[in-house]
Design a protein with these regions (language model features):
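Alpha-helix-loop-beta-strand connector modules within alpha/beta enzyme cores
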Residues: 64-84, 125-130, 186-194, 245-260
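N-terminal active-site wall of soluble small-molecule enzyme domains
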Residues: 56-103, 116-117
Length: 350
């Protein structure tokens, strides 16, 4: 599905330039906290305020949001600051309550976008409603599932749609809370070029010191906007305190961003080169991981007096990867060469 008639997420009074910025606390905690954050962000010329009213937590027992009462606080934000307000919805009831309260923009979280049943319920609840809706990527790196979630909303008649890249869960321990895997949103942009694409550096990084570099990387990749968690006293936040920044820090970060024009004639070449660089980074990380596992296998063989080279297993690897290469349109000889080089040292022979 091409979705050629998607519309920009433009709200009156917001300049149509990059980056579109949505900011506010992870959670609406108290009326005073919400209003303080909104006033501080409005003073920094942020136009769209975000706050979680319902918080889907990974485990029970954590703060799960203030619920409907928080929508009244968002109404006060609109009335007192003139900002647009946004929140996350995960059920039909959430949609009903948010629309009734006059929320201007909705987003759908990673746990919800991963569930086709939940997405269909939300699509039904939003049918006939003209409101911007942003869809976060599913928790797992599944581009088709992400596109499918967007398609369900599109099929319900929504045209002001966008996507939020918030990274992907992984068992591997790295500096990120959620792995960026930039090639996935890049492929989403290639498949749906008219779909606005925002980055959530707070959830990707999981640490406030990573928000600025991740935001710059998103701008370098041509993302249209940022959704950032900002709290007046982040160390006292009731949820995700490590990944929130103060409004002043956010303002400084936004002013130091380098936003390059995407209409330059060299932009396609630069974007392709950036894609190659990031794919190379991921390939090297995967190769390093594979080598670590290979060394563990080699050590096991040594401890159990097993031969380092097991020809049958080695032939199986080369034959299987060669067949996969053909299916993917890759020269199988290049794959064989890569495997031979990867197994040059005895401990790498798996």
């Amino acid at each position: 599905m091409e979705m050629n008639d998607l519309q920009p997420i433009i709200l009156p009074g917001i300049p149509a330039r990059r980056p579109l910025v949505i900011a506010g606390p992870c959670s609406a905690e108290t009326e005073e906290q919400v209003l303080a954050a909104a006033r501080a962000l409005a003073a920094q010329e942020v136009k769209i305020f975000r706050a979680g009213i319902w918080k889907p937590r990974t485990k029970p027992g954590g703060f799960e949001g203030v619920g409907v009462e928080g929508l009244r606080w968002l109404q006060r934000v609109k009335a007192e600051t003139g900002m647009y307000v946004s929140t996350e919805v995960a059920t039909e009831r959430h949609v009903f309550e948010a629309l009734k309260a006059g929320v201007d923009l909705l987003w759908i979280g990673a746990r919800t976008s991963a569930n086709p049943f939940a997405m269909q319920e939300l699509a039904g609840a939003l049918r006939g409603v003209d409101i911007p809706v942003l869809v976060k990527n599913p928790v797992n790196p599944d581009l088709e599932l992400w596109i499918g979630a967007i398609e369900r909303l599109y099929n319900a008649g929504l045209r002001r749609l966008g996507a939020i890249h918030r990274g992907f869960s992984s068992y591997d321990r790295t500096i990120y809370r959620n792995q960026p895997q930039w090639h996935i949103p890049i492929e989403l942009r290639r498949r749906l070029p008219q779909l606005p694409l925002l980055c959530d550096p707070s959830h990707i990084g999981g640490k406030r010191e990573l928000i600025a570099p991740l935001s710059q990387e998103a701008m370098d990749l041509g993302f249209d906007g940022l959704i950032v968690e900002s709290h007046c006293t982040p160390d006292e936040a009731w949820s995700d305190k490590q990944q929130q920044v103060t409004p002043d820090v956010l303002c400084f970060m936004l002013h130091t961003l380098v936003v390059r024009e995407t209409t330059q004639t060299t932009e396609p070449l630069a974007e392709l080169r950036q894609q190659i660089d990031r794919l190379d980074d991921e390939l090297l990380a995967l190769m390093a991981k594979r080598m670590r596992i290979s060394r563990e296998i080699g050590q096991y063989k040594k401890e159990h007096s097993m031969p380092i080279l097991q020809a049958k297993r080695y032939d199986e690897i080369l034959n299987k990867r060669g067949a996969q290469a053909v299916e993917l349109g890759i020269n199988p000889e290049s794959v064989s060469y890569t495997h031979l080089r990867a197994h040059e040292t005895p401990e790498q022979l798996v």
